[in-house]
């Protein structure tokens, strides 16, 4: 049932790219995998002109820029056209087209978890103790600067790639094994953090383009316990859409 009696006269384009693999197949240029038909259904209840647009070539993007919709809703980070990388949201900014998600600079900060943690600390926001390491850098448990249990994941990347049931480690042997696995599978250093048990949250922050005010929209992510008894939003959970999301309504 549509609770909105009067729709807002706005044009929104839900932008997607062709996925050559199965559902939720990983694409380097896609940061957020959208369920575009569900989004279309939801937004169409409130706005007059909502469509799904697939971008396959530069001309498709050029046509979108000419249409200049009121909002582009997309999880795409960039396109590769004629061996040239075009960052979607940076391009939209040049044409004064509002969008969701982040521009290239913010995505780079997000993707590099070591940099992201340091920016968080600089902003005086609490975060779990951490360090970055590679295989062979620590020869004993006493050389590790923070106490077990630890959470180990690749220092770069998204989609929880490299995060699994073995990411929580309770001893030196498990620590070494996971750090080595990340190096072999992804050729990356490991970000190691103090393991924080408890609930999982994600917070979207939207900026009002008319006055610059920010609005936080937190959700709690519900995940079943894995074989080790931990609730972890790992790669397989995301890939298989096994998590549930509920809005946080507590004003505190």
Roles of regions detected by a PLM:
Residues 1-99, 105, 111, 115, ...:
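ATP-binding N-terminal substructure of ATP-dependent carboxylate-amine bond-forming enzymes
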Residues 4-19, 65-66, 108-191, 197-198, ...:
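Active-site nucleotide/adenylate-binding loops and adjacent lid/helix of ATP-dependent enzymes
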Residues 81, 158-160, 226:
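Short glycine/serine/proline-enriched coil/turn segments at secondary-structure junctions
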Residues 100, 128-129, 217, 233:
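A short, local hydrophobic-aromatic micro-motif
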Residues 100-102, 159-162, 244-247:
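Short small-residue beta-strand/loop micro-motif enriched in glycine and branched aliphatics
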Residues 171-252:
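Phosphate-binding site of ATP-dependent enzymes
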């Amino acid at each position: 049932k549509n609770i909105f009696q009067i729709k807002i006269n706005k044009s929104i384009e839900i932008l997607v790219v062709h996925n050559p693999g199965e559902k939720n197949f990983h694409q380097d240029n896609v940061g957020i995998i959208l369920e575009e038909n569900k989004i279309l259904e939801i937004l169409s209840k409130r706005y007059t002109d909502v469509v799904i647009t697939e971008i396959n070539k530069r001309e498709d993007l050029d046509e979108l820029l000419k249409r200049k919709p009121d909002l582009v809703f997309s999880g795409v980070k960039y396109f590769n056209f004629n061996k040239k990388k075009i960052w979607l949201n940076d391009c939209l900014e040049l044409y004064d087209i509002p969008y969701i998600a982040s521009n290239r600079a913010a995505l780079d900060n997000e993707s590099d978890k070591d940099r992201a943690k340091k920016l968080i600390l600089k902003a005086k926001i609490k975060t779990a103790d951490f360090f970055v390491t590679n295989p062979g850098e620590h020869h004993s448990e006493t050389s590790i600067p923070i106490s077990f249990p630890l959470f180990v994941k690749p220092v770069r990347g998204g989609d929880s790639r490299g995060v699994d049931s073995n990411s929580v480690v309770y001893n030196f042997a498990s620590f070494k094994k996971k750090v080595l696995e990340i190096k072999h599978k992804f050729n990356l250093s490991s970000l190691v953090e103090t393991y924080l048990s408890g609930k999982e949250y994600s917070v979207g922050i939207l900026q009002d383009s008319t006055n610059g005010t920010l609005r936080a929209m937190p959700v709690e992510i519900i995940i079943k316990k894995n074989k080790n008894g931990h609730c972890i939003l790992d790669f397989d959970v995301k890939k298989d859409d096994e998590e549930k999301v509920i809005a946080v309504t507590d004003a505190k």
